[in-house]
Amino acid sequence: MEKNFNIKQIKLKSEELRKKFIKLLINGFKYHIGGTLSCLDLLVVLFYSNFFKIASKNRDFFLLSKGHALAIFNIILIDKKLLSYAKLEKGYKKKNFGGQLDIFNSKFVDWNTGSLGHSLGVGIGLSIRNPKKKIWILVGDAEFEEGSVWEALFYISQNKIKNIIIIIDRNKMSASSSIQKKDIFDKKILHQLNLNILKINGHNHSDIFKCYKKCKKQIFSSIIIADTIKGKGYKILENNPKYSHQTPSIAVLKSLVK
């Protein structure tokens, strides 16, 4: 797997997809900007470093629990020629705000999204039914305010579920408030679950790669706490709660992709 990792190419791919996301906004699509950009690097390493072969018939499972970040997932599908821009545009012909993933719209979507906090439970079901496959789940840190997340974690721990990899996009902000001081992400607390706990810089491609590689080899489930920045890549967007629901002017957006 390591021979497939080219740090320079991965960094360039992140930059490329980040610009493609901004261009979608310029074209009239409206998405949750901050939370999409915070997890972009995590997904680029996952899908472009041979960890997750999304086009494979016998692939693992991926659940984007924070479904409001679906834009980057769709951009990856388009980039891999698994989704056409025309189909994306048709699906969003009214170009309403946001959107969610739907298993009936794509064979590459493994679970519907919408209400937060439920994908871990779904992941448990998939893991039990598919014990030889890895279940990758990307969750937002704000989802840990949902009791269903903790119930799922306790179940994974108590029943020694072995094949789930949970990636926490720890951007320290929900849609409306800061969750920077929450102590639930302290490794000491999570270690009580007796799972493999790792903490990384969620924008350092090399660190992400090494972490994923380690988790792939583990014989028990893992939790990755990825410290990220909401709106990563553009200073005007970074850690700005306004852009959880608002979109900058076209002039500002165009200035970002010059």
State each model region's role.
Residues 205-258:
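Glycine/aspartate-rich loop-and-adjacent alpha/beta segment that forms the canonical ThDP
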Residues 13-30, 169-170:
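N-terminal capping segment at the start of a domain
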Residues 74-76, 148-150, 176-180, 233-239:
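Short acidic, glycine/serine/threonine-rich loops at helix termini
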Residues 60-62, 133-137, 164, 218-228:
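Generic beta-sheet signal
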Residues 1-10:
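Non-catalytic, mobile gating and regulatory segments of ester bond hydrolases
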Residues 108-216:
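Thiamine diphosphate
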Residues 41, 68-69, 171-172, 204, ...:
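Glycine-rich beta-alpha junction loops
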Residues 21, 31, 36-159:
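Cofactor-binding active-site loop characterized by glycine-rich and histidine/acidic residues
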